[in-house]
């Protein structure tokens, strides 16, 4: 069996370190691409049919409304994960958990019996509620401990050996098969 990475990310206006800045590539996407280079597995992006606004504060309000209303945005596609036994799932932290797009992916995917290796990007909240929420959506999965990283560190991941070392140590603790 093999491993795959499934991630959700958002570029544009984002909270970066201590303020709002425009980023060309989302933090979680950069982290997912780095992990893919290290372990050589397939990579799938979770994309919603709706487009989130580019403006940071408005986007956070959209995310809050989705969470409060238990609204699951429709996804463009759902990857077929049958041939994978290990799934790395990456996402930003929005309102103390993963975005509802990730929740939609989790509830529509059969991840029962698979090893789930979650990771997230954030700007200070850490994993927050996402570990317990992941268990709700994947009750029959073998869920590893989360890896969490400040999102702004992903913007220079290729030039930051300390960040690379932290990621690589986490990957070593979560051996996978390709």
Language model segments and positions:
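Residue-level detector of flexible, active-site-proximal loop/helix-junction positions
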Residues: 12, 48-50, 123, 150-153
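Short C-terminal domain-edge/linker segments immediately following a structured domain
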Residues: 33-39, 73-77, 117-123, 147-152
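Structural beta-sheet core signal
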Residues: 5-7, 43, 89, 118-120, ...
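Glycine-rich phosphate/pyrophosphate-binding loop and the adjoining helix
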Residues: 142-178
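Soluble non-cytosolic domains of exported or imported proteins
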Residues: 22-26, 96, 124-128, 157, ...
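N-terminal beta1-alpha1-beta2 submodule of the flavodoxin-like/Rossmannoid cofactor-binding fold
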Residues: 1-86, 96, 165-178
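Noncatalytic linker/hinge segments flanking ATPase motor cores
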Residues: 43-49, 86, 127-137, 155-166
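Helix-loop-strand module that forms the ligand-binding subsite of alpha/beta enzymes
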Residues: 51, 55-142
């Amino acid at each position: 069996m093999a491993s795959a990475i499934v991630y959700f990310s958002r570029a544009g206006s984002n909270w970066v370190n201590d303020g709002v800045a425009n980023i060309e590539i989302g933090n979680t996407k950069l982290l997912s691409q780095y992990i893919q280079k290290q372990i050589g597995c397939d990579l799938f992006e979770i994309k919603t049919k709706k487009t989130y606004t580019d403006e940071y504060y408005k986007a956070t309000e959209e995310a809050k409304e989705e969470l409060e209303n238990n609204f699951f945005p429709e996804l463009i596609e759902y990857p077929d994960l049958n041939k994978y036994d290990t799934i790395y799932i990456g996402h930003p932290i929005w309102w103390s958990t993963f975005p509802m797009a990730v929740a939609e992916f989790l509830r529509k995917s059969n991840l029962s019996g698979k090893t789930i290796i979650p990771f997230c990007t954030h700007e200070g909240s850490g994993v927050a509620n996402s570990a317990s929420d992941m268990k709700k959506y994947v009750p029959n999965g073998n869920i590893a401990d989360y890896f969490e990283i400040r999102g702004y560190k992903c913007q220079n991941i290729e030039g930051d050996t300390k960040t690379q070392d932290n990621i690589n140590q986490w990957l070593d603790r979560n051996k996978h098969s390709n």
